Design a protein with these regions (language model features):
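Helical mechanochemical/support elements of P-loop NTPase systems and associated helical scaffolds
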Residues: 26, 52, 65, 91-95, ...
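Canonical P-loop GTPase G-domain recognition
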Residues: 7-19, 149-196
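Conserved G1/Walker A P-loop phosphate-binding module
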Residues: 1-86, 196
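Conserved alpha-helical scaffold flanking the Walker A/P-loop in AAA+ ATPase domains
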Residues: 64-68, 97-105
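Flexible beta-alpha connector loops of hexameric P-loop NTPases
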Residues: 82-92, 119, 148-151
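Conserved amphipathic alpha-helical interaction elements at protein-protein interfaces in regulatory
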Residues: 49-53, 105, 135, 193
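Conserved C-terminal guanine-recognition region of P-loop GTPase G domains, centered on the G4
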Residues: 100-171
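Hydrophobic packing within well-folded, soluble alpha/beta domains
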Residues: 43, 112-113, 187
Length: 196
């Protein structure tokens, strides 16, 4: 395998409603997780250099299954967004169970990309996710999304505050924007480091 991933080869593989349906890992995997409407699908599309490979919706909570994509023998896993209030409690519980079951399963967790909106302080669910990843010693990074909505000064201030609140080392935090492409090369570098 080369020292970089050819993202132009990205394709949709499958969608799963239950973890038990997912085949065993056969290649490196990068999992993307974050609150509903954090910009997960947009960041993945920017990574792949595609507009609509990962379905983007203006309706939060649209992704309700675990979706697998593949590029150059690396799997990219789009997990359902957590914490969307306008879904029923049963649906929110199903998603929480689905995400929990996924991370409890025996898989190739080469890298977990936890996405947090840079404009807001991390929610309790964001804290819970980071605590879980840290407590279980996952290799993870935090992607701060929607950086284009803030000035550079505001970005730096918010990034510093979020790092402190989440207790995450500076080198594990990347400021990103799906609009401008900020941070995408760094994200690709971290993925290659973890998977190749």
């Amino acid at each position: 395998m080369a020292d970089s991933i050819n993202y132009q080869l990205a394709k949709f593989v499958a969608s799963y409603g239950k973890v038990s349906q997912i085949p065993e890992s056969t290649c490196p995997e990068v999992s993307f997780v974050g609150r509903s409407n954090v910009g997960k699908s947009s960041i993945m599309n920017k990574l792949f250099g595609r507009k609509n490979l990962v379905k983007v919706s203006s309706t939060p909570g649209k992704t309700s299954n675990i979706n697998f994509f593949e590029a150059d023998d690396v799997h990219f896993v789009d997990l359902p967004g957590y914490g969307f209030a306008r879904r029923s409690k049963a649906e929110r519980d199903r998603w929480a169970d689905l995400i929990g079951d996924f991370f409890d399963s025996e898989r190739s967790f080469n890298l977990v990309v936890s996405l947090v909106d840079i404009r807001h302080d991390p929610s309790k669910l964001d804290h819970d996710m980071i605590d879980y990843l840290q407590g279980n010693e996952f290799n993870f990074i935090v992607c701060l999304t929607k950086a284009d909505k803030l000035s550079r000064t505001q970005q730096a201030r918010q990034a510093a505050a979020i790092k402190k609140q989440l207790n995450v080392p500076a080198e594990n935090v990347i400021i990103t924007s799906s609009q401008t492409g900020t941070g995408i090369d760094e994200l690709k570098r971290r993925i290659a480091e973890a998977c190749l």
